[in-house]
Every structure is written in structure tokens, then in C-alpha cells.
């Protein structure tokens, strides 16, 4: 969530480096090797990756409820391919630099992630919280 004064990360990063996720995975018979599930996947929750479902990978998300007040401008939904290469300040800067070109914002974010060397799957959705829909 972004406005001109603050950036707020409101989701839980479900990664194999998280102690709670490690414990959950190991209880389900999985192994963390080199901070990856079965040595393959850095995230601990995912759609797909069916070969790891019996090793502790689940698709159940953490859900966060957030009151959206009038001060918030944008909500960025992005994959770990974006977040592993760009931080909140990077995304905020890109967002407000491209405010007059909203339709291009997600493309610019994903291109910047690629420029920073991300080789993971990269996807991004930008939600304009100020736009009124009638």
C-alpha cells in the first residue's frame, strides 16, 4: 500500500527461511535444503509445483485485512520475482514517477525487476485506490 508519505508492506512473505514455515514444512515431512523446499523452491506456499505438495508445500495464503482510507493511492500485488529485487522505496519511486502513465506502471515495475537481475517469475498488478468506478 502506498501514498506519498508512507509505504506499507501488509502481506506475509511465505519463504522457507521463516522459522514458522520451516517447522510447518518439516512436520509435514518436507526438508529445507539451502533455504529451499527440497532444495528447489524458495517460497513455502504456492499454486502449482505439484511435485512438492507431499513435502509441505501448501497453497493456503495468509490473509491480511486492511482498512483502506482516503490517504492511500495504490496497492501493488507482485510476485517474489519483483519483491526479491525491488524494495518498497524502489516500488514507491517507480509508482509516483509514472503516476501520469498508470497503464504502464506495472510494466515499468517488472522491467526494473528484470534490470536488477531477477530471473524468477515476474508478475505485477497495480490497483489505483483513488479511481472512482461508476
Region locations from a protein language model:
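PP2C/PPM-type serine/threonine phosphatase catalytic core
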Residues: 1-134
Amino acid at each position: 500500500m502506498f501514498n506519498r508519505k508512507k509505504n506499507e508492506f501488509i502481506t506475509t512473505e511465505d519463504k522457507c527461511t521463516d522459522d514458522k514455515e520451516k517447522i510447518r514444512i518439516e512436520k509435514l515431512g518436507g526438508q529445507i535444503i539451502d533455504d529451499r523446499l527440497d532444495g528447489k523452491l524458495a517460497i513455502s506456499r504456492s499454486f502449482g509445483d505439484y511435485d512438492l505438495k507431499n513435502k509441505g508445500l501448501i497453497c493456503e495464503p495468509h490473509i491480511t485485512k486492511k482498512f483502506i482510507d482516503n490517504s492511500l493511492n495504490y496497492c501493488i500485488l507482485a510476485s517474489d520475482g519483483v519483491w526479491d529485487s525491488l524494495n518498497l522505496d524502489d516500488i514507491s519511486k517507480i509508482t509516483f514517477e509514472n503516476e501520469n502513465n498508470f497503464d504502464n506502471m506495472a510494466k515499468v515495475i517488472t522491467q526494473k525487476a528484470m534490470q536488477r537481475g531477477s530471473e524468477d517469475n515476474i508478475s505485477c498488478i497495480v490497483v489505483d485506490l483513488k479511481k472512482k468506478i461508476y
